């Protein structure tokens, strides 16, 4: 499996894992500041970008092996791990499978999955139902806007829309990744020992904000940082604040 990755900066290793339909470009707003403090590793998940796109469906556990492959190829035995959305589910599988490879864990806008998962917000359910009837670019624009919070920075929706057009996901790869979002480690997360921070926007229309409370109740000692009024892509809405929160937690 060829997994495309890059490394920026020095310091303690920090692995970033993106979510559904986003390549490693999805971390761009926070890269410069993080790279001043850490050796930042980011990669394209299988099914997107410059990484291989094997036939799906994928599981989050399979995608976690890709993340471990990046650590191996980078010569990193142990790293801090930040995962967003589907990337947060992958990060959970990673730390469950190889707890010795994870120093501290940051789970962003994500879920533990399973029967206790709070339901997807109605706005996103309606959008998924309506999207097939819309012009593809209109649907994409709606999905971009839906992933932002109550008062996003001026021009951010335009910027993200343009980037999504420049970096279209492979349709089969997107479907294969989406299938991974239905897989989860189950009871195993109750034994996660890595210090864990859960970061969640209170206006997330994609992942129900109540998922943060469920995760915190499952992972021993987990801390929660709620970002008032921010949406699913809060690290695009307020990148500086996110870097500060993560850096203070990681040390």
Model regions: which residues?
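Conserved HGGG/HGGXW glycine-rich cap/lid loop of the alpha/beta-hydrolase fold
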Residues: 4-56
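Conserved alpha/beta-hydrolase catalytic His-Asp/Glu region
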Residues: 136-189
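Conserved alpha/beta-hydrolase "acid-adjacent" motif
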Residues: 205-211
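Catalytic histidine neighborhood in serine/cysteine hydrolases
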Residues: 213-233
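Catalytic histidine-centered segment of alpha/beta-hydrolase-like enzymes
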Residues: 230-243
